[in-house]
């Protein structure tokens, strides 16, 4: 995942900067304490849902990656949305598909999941 930023309300933009986040698509949430949370689907093994938190929205530390789930059977997952239901309590919604079934190529079963978690569990 790459990021760009603007210091002038979008009139100009920085060059793209790589982040340590290996996934997409991202969803950004400003937490009640001012930090920025990015939730995303990891579409490479181990497949699942991840989160990173940044103090400033510019620097991201891979060591701070939080694994919400790593049990997805394939890369068809993601589109997370996170909300802070109260300070420090996060609810993240996303979709995952079941494992590919070669006997039923038209099986498009999809499930919407949620993970309720506490920031304090990872700090």
Model regions: which residues?
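Asp-box/BNR beta-propeller blade signature and adjacent active/binding-site loops
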Residues: 1-123
């Amino acid at each position: 995942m790459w990021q760009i930023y603007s210091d002038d309300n979008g009139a100009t933009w920085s060059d793209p900067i790589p982040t340590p986040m290996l996934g997409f698509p991202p969803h950004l949430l400003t937490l009640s304490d001012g930090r920025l949370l990015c939730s995303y689907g990891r579409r490479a093994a181990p497949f699942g849902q991840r989160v990173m938190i940044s103090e400033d929205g510019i620097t991201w530390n891979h060591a701070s990656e939080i694994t919400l789930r790593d049990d997805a059977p394939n890369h068809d997952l993601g589109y997370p949305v996170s909300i802070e239901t109260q300070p420090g309590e996060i609810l993240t919604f996303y979709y995952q598909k079941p494992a590919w079934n070669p006997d039923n190529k038209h099986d498009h079963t999809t499930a919407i999941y949620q993970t309720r978690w506490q920031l304090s569990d990872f700090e």
